[in-house]
Amino acid sequence: MRTISAALVALLLIPAFTSTPGAQGHERAMGVWVLNVEKSTMQPGPKPKLQSSTFTQLPDGSVKIETDVTDASGQTGHREMVSRFDGKQEARSGAPQPSTRAYRWLDEVNFEFEEMISGQRSVIGRTTTSKDGKVRTLTVNGMRNGQPVHNVEVYERQSTSGTPR
């Protein structure tokens, strides 16, 4: 009887010790976030006309990040990647230059990333999210194409799921 009870306890505890660290506690960071162009600053410019980022948590705990942008001249673009938020560089498709990003969580809703272009460190971004979870500010600093970058990008949550309202 003791053996059966011990085996049952072990079976119940296995999921608690084997769950993916990224799979728990980051639900408030997911959803569709739309850039408020008027409240944002981007140096060097110009600012995009439209930009949105969709963060979708996948079953294995990783996060799919999709960014859609319409630049100042009206050209559209789509960037996509999946990150485990473990600080390791991962490929990003659709970017104007070959790039990777390494994401990591700072807490339940905030994160930072390091971007590399053609193997060289480019920019670092860090988010802060309002207490009500409706506004995310992304500060990006570094160098791109030989120019200093300093962006303060203000995003407003449009949806808590992966589809816009």
Task: Cite the ranges covered by each PLM segment.
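Bacterial N-terminal signal peptides
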Residues: A7-A16
